[in-house]
Amino acid sequence: MTRTKNSSPIDSLVESEPVRDAARALIDAVQREASDRTLSPESYQKCIGELEQMRGRPLMFPMLTSGAGKGARVRMADGTMKLDFIGGIGVYAFGHNDEDLLEAAVVAAAGDAVFQGHLMPGPEAVRLSRALLRHTGERLKHVWLALSGAVANENALKMIFQKHTPADKIIVFERGFHGRTMAMAELTDRPAFREGLPLTGNVLHVPFYDPEDPESTDKTLRALEDHLRRFPGQVAGMCFEMIQGEGGFRTAPREYFVAVMELCKEAGVAVWVDEVQTFVRTGELFAFRRLELDEWVDIATAGKLLQGSATIFTEDYNPRAGLVAGTYAGSTVGMAVGTRIIERLEDEGYLGEEGRISLLGRRIQRHLQSLAKRMPEAIGACVGTGAMQAFVPWNGAPDVVKAVLEAAFEDGLILLGAGSNPGKIRMLPPVSTTDAVSYTHLTLPTICSV
C-alpha cells in the first residue's frame, strides 16, 4: 500500500522501509500460526461457556473469533467463516486483517508505551490530532483525544456546562443514544439502559424528524421553544445525531438541522454533534460537514472507526485546566491505526458524493430495494447513508428482529438490530467491502423467510 510521504521527523519511524519490512515478516508469521490453530467443536463451546459464566450473562451471539479473516470475512476459533456486516459495532474500517493497518499497528506496538496519556503524549497523538483537524473546518480548532465514544461525549458535556454555568440542562432528541456512562445513560432515550440508575432530571427531550409528518420540523421547534421558555437561562446545550444509530438509522434533511440549530444559536445554547457512530460512514469524516452545517457546530465527537475517540471544539469551548484530563488519551496502536485509516480515506477515493463509501451505500440501497420488490412483506423500509444501512424485517416487532438476526448468524452473516416501533436490521460493513452487496442479495431472502 502506497504511503503518503513527507519530511517530518515525527513520521520517520512509520515511513522507514526496514521497519515496515520487519513488521510484514512478523505479521506473516503470526498469520501462518493462526491459520493452523483451530479449536475442536467441544473446546470451542467450552470456551464460550466459560466466558459467558465469567461475564455473568450470555454473549449476544455464541462466537469467538480467531484473529484471522479478510475484509468482511472473519474466521471463528472453530475454523468456520462468517461475513461480518457489523464490524465489531462499527470499528473495522477496512475489514479484518487489513495488511496495511496491521503493519501500522505492529510498528506502533513495538514502541515505548502501550497507551499514551495527556501527561506524556507521543508522536502518534500528534499525527492523529493533525489528521482529524484537516477535516473539521475553520471553527473547530482544538481536539482532545480519549478512549471510548462515551468518554468523548462526557468531555463535550463538561465543556458545555463549564462554558454556560450556571445552566444545568441539556436537550437531546427522542430515541437518541450517546453512551453508557452515568451521564450518557441519562442522555440516551432508552429506559432499559438506565434501569435502577438515579437521574438528575436535567435532560430534556424533543421529537426527531419524521419524514412522514409534514409538520415534523415545526413540532421539534415548538418543543424546543417550550423548553427554553420553561427554563430560561438554564439550558446549556443541545446534542444532535446526524443519523440516529441505535435509534434506527433515522436522519433528517439539512434544512431541518439548520432550523433547529438556528434556534439554539438565537437562545445562546451550544450545538454539540455526536458523531461517534457516523464518523466516516456517511462519505465524509464528519456528517455535519457533509450537510454543510459548520457555521453552527460548537463541539463534535468522534469514535468507533477512529480506533479511539475525540472531542473537537471551538476556541470558545476550550476548557479551563483541570476540567478534562485522565490517565489515558488512547492506545498507541489505536492512534497509529486511526491516523492510517484517515490517510487512506483521503488518498484512495473513499470520500465525497462520488467516493467509494457513497457508492457502496447506493449499491446496497439498490439491492435492498430490489429485494423489497421481490419480498414486499418480508423487507420493508430501507434506510441509510453510505456504510450505514438498515431495513425493516416484516413488521419490525422485537421477536421478528431477533429471529432474523439468529437466522442470519446461523447462515453465516453477522448483523445487529436498531430502533424500535418498528425495529430494523442494521449493517455497518467495512467501507472497502464488495461482499456486502452480493452476499446480502443471496442471503437475505433466506433469513427473512423465518
Language model segments and positions:
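Conserved N-terminal phosphate-binding loop of PLP-dependent enzymes in the Aspartate aminotransferase
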Residues: 2-442, 449
